[in-house]
Amino acid sequence: RVTTLADYNKNETPIEGSLRYGIEKSNQPRTIIFDVSGIIELKRGLYLNEYPNLSIIGQTAPGDGITLKNYNFTFNLSKDPAIGAGGSLNAIVRFLRCRPGDQFADYGEDAIGGRYFKDAIIDHITAGWSVDETLTFYGVQNFTAQWCIASESMNLSNHAKGAHGYG
């Protein structure tokens, strides 16, 4: 259960009730629901790599829902393309806005993306305001992106290759 919009970094004390704590506290099957709404200012990227068997149910947030800001939201199980789709992520993520912006981006960050995993659904996700692509998934199996919006990326931002953002 998410009860705070706060986030923490690797060298900081974990904050119980935060979205990151709910994701990282266990590999056991779990469902994350929200008692709060607003903007979560991420202190680092949010990765599901090591934390499978997860449902994030964003529509439980009251009011205007949840926006993730400052960093990307990534689904990866392997960084080796020779492996192809890695293990089962077994994840469902619904009703979130992913808008990293460029304040902390030091390379081509996507708003939400992932590679080399199996078994995941994203639903009613809005992805935008990224330095690189907004919604990027490849090398995956049994993956569904439904009722999602891939909106504008930041073409003239701080991408290492110059004008870049390709939506």
Predicted regions and their residues:
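Extracellular beta-strand-rich solenoid/capping regions of secreted or surface-exposed proteins
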Residues: 15-28, 40-57, 64-94, 100-117, ...
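Acidic glycine-/aspartate-rich tracts in secreted/extracellular proteins
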Residues: 6-8, 30, 37-39, 60-63
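Short, conserved catalytic or adaptor-binding loops enriched in Gly and charged residues
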Residues: 1, 58-60
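Right-handed parallel beta-helix
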Residues: 53, 57-58, 86-100, 116-129, ...
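Conserved positions at the start
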Residues: 80, 109, 122, 132-134, ...
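A cross-family glycoside hydrolase active-site/sugar-binding cleft signature
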Residues: 35, 136
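Right-handed parallel beta-helix/beta-solenoid
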Residues: 1-16
